[in-house]
Every structure is written in structure tokens, then in C-alpha cells.
């Protein structure tokens, strides 16, 4: 019985971050990404090598990075003011949009 409870608790711990990341709406994120495209491009692959590829990144990683830029925990002269006005919903939507694009998570053949 204890093993079953432990397994359920472990599963909940593992799956909870995935559920939180899945809350974003990729379609809304695409509409909200207009400012992002100036550096990260329409396809999320960056317009130059100095800009990070967002396409295919994990949504939870993208959301965490944006929240850290917004709070000042992560510093970047360009990203801090970009993330500052974003709501949690905006961040979830943007993260879902960029995670939905072909990119880093796309298997190669």
C-alpha cells in the first residue's frame, strides 16, 4: 500500500510541471510573438547566430527563462525589458507557441 502511494506521489511530482507548461495556447502565443520575431525570427530560429533558437525548446524551460527575465533573477539588457510587461498567461502562451515549432526537439533522420 505504501509503495502504491509513493508511486502516485512520484507520478504527480513528475507530471505536475508538464501540466503547468501545457496550459499555454500556441495560437495566442503566435499572435503575441510579434515583438519576439525582431530577434528570434518568424520561425523561432533567430535572425542571426547571436539570438537563441526558441523553436522546439521545452515550454517549461522557455516559461522559466521569461519569468526569470521578468523578475530580474536572470539579467539581459534586451530580454529584461521585453519580459517585464508579460503576464503569466502571456508567458505560457509564448512558451507553448515556440515549443510547438519544429526545432531543437525535432528528431533528425
Summary of predicted features, one role per range:
Residues 1-10:
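Bacterial N-terminal signal peptides that target proteins for export
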Residues 15-33, 47-50, 103-109:
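Electrostatic cytochrome c docking/interface patches
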Residues 34-42, 94:
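The canonical Cys-X-X-Cys-His
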Residues 35-38, 76, 88:
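Mobile acidic interaction elements
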